[in-house]
Regions:
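Active-site gating/metal-coordination segments in enzymes
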Residues: 55-56, 64-157, 161
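Active-site environment of divalent metal-dependent phosphoester hydrolases
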Residues: 10-13, 64-67, 96-100, 123-125, ...
Length: 280
């Protein structure tokens, strides 16, 4: 079984003319200003899943500043889950600084979504204000069966690119320490914080409820990142994610084949870990 845990879907009107939605949405413009940045709908996704051998995709929208846009995008995700039962699962997405974020999380969970994500703090990093804004949403997730929250992270070093935030490893660690009971997925390998699982003190405890997805891995890391996750003892917490439509799964399949993982370990990453995590 192959489960892609990191996929983005948008309403058709945004796919047709994204430029109409740049005003007042600096984060969206930052990531999608280039016409080469692909935008997809549910039918596009299913066609790609069938082509690439993906059984299930976990999809989300975008953390729009405009609450109406956030609701509309979440409605598209809900519709996709209902249209393709067993193939698509969904996460609610919004700007957590919005006063109605927790209620929107509840609405989406009631409608059948499986958690929250990909939440992002593209311009600020995960600072104290960001942590405080997460509190009501994290409480909702705990109260609803400890559903997961996926949060955008990135490596604090290296080349710049659209969507690279000023987040630090200290901030990522503080996120884990602030919400020790929540199940949190750190997108994009958690900015590399999983390497610190090899430390003898503190980090293993701090990161006990943290998972890591592989989204954009082929742009960021050598295939040895999978071997390092294995050596760090966190391979069972690695979730396959493509960031589709940014990348298709076959790029990741090839990357995994270049790693030193066994067939059984590759199967863990590609789907078994996510099946356990999401209860498939």
């Amino acid at each position: 079984m192959i489960i892609d845990t990191h996929v983005h879907l948008f309403p058709d009107k945004i796919k047709e003319d994204r430029t109409l939605f740049f005003d007042g949405e600096p984060e969206f413009k930052l990531l999608y200003d280039s016409p080469r940045s692909p935008i997809a709908g549910a039918d596009d996704l299913i066609a790609t899943m069938d082509e690439q051998g993906v059984d299930i995709s976990v999809v989300s929208g975008f953390p729009w500043r405009n609450p109406d846009l956030a609701r509309q995008n979440n409605d598209i995700v809900i519709e996709a889950v209902l249209k393709y039962p067993g193939r698509i699962r969904g996460l609610a997405c919004f700007d957590v600084s919005w006063a109605g974020a927790a209620k929107e999380a509840e609405r989406c969970i009631d409608a059948g979504l499986s958690g929250v994500g990909e939440l992002a703090f593209y311009l600020s990093g995960i600072d104290r204000t960001a942590l405080e804004s997460l509190v009501p949403v994290m409480e909702v997730l705990r109260n609803r069966g400890n559903l997961p929250c996926m949060i955008h992270t990135n490596e604090p070093l290296g080349h710049a690119y659209p969507g690279k935030t000023p987040v630090t490893l200290e901030q990522i660690n503080e996120l884990a320490r602030t919400f020790p009971e929540n199940r949190i997925i750190l997108a994009h390998w958690g900015g590399g914080i999983f390497f610190y699982h090899i430390m003898k003190k503190q980090l293993k405890t701090d990161l006990k409820n943290i998972w890591y997805d592989t989204a954009a891995s082929v742009f960021l890391y050598d295939s040895a990142v999978y071997d390092m996750a294995d050596r760090a003892g966190v391979l069972d917490k690695v979730l396959f994610g493509t960031d589709y439509p940014l990348l298709k799964p076959d790029r990741y399949y090839a990357d995994l084949d270049r790693s030193g993982l066994t067939r059984e370990q590759k199967e863990m990453v590609l789907g078994k870990n996510a099946a356990v995590f999401y209860g498939n």
